[in-house]
From Swiss-Prot:
Designated name of the protein: Large ribosomal subunit protein bL33c
The species this protein was found in: Daucus carota
GO biological process terms held by the UniProt record: translation
Gene Ontology MF term list: structural constituent of ribosome
Plastid among keywords: yes
Length: 66
């Protein structure tokens, strides 16, 4: 039996380095990843270290609102 609907939701992770720097002067764009999270296990905002092709390094990517 399922306890509830929509336990796993799709979230968008955005590079915090690109947003903070106002997008690099060299290239335009902001790195975004799409992933899923379980609301019961992680009720707060998700933050992961992912590779940003615009910053050319691994940076923190935080969950954004849809």
């Amino acid at each position: 039996m399922a306890k509830g609907k929509d336990v796993r939701i799709t979230v968008i992770l955005e590079c915090t380095g690109c947003v903070r720097n106002g997008v690099n002067k060299v290239s335009t764009g902001i790195s975004r990843y799409i992933t899923e999270k379980n609301r019961h296990n992680t009720p707060n905002r998700l933050e992961l270290r992912k590779f940003c092709p615009f910053c050319y390094k691994h940076t923190m990517h935080g969950e954004i609102k849809k």
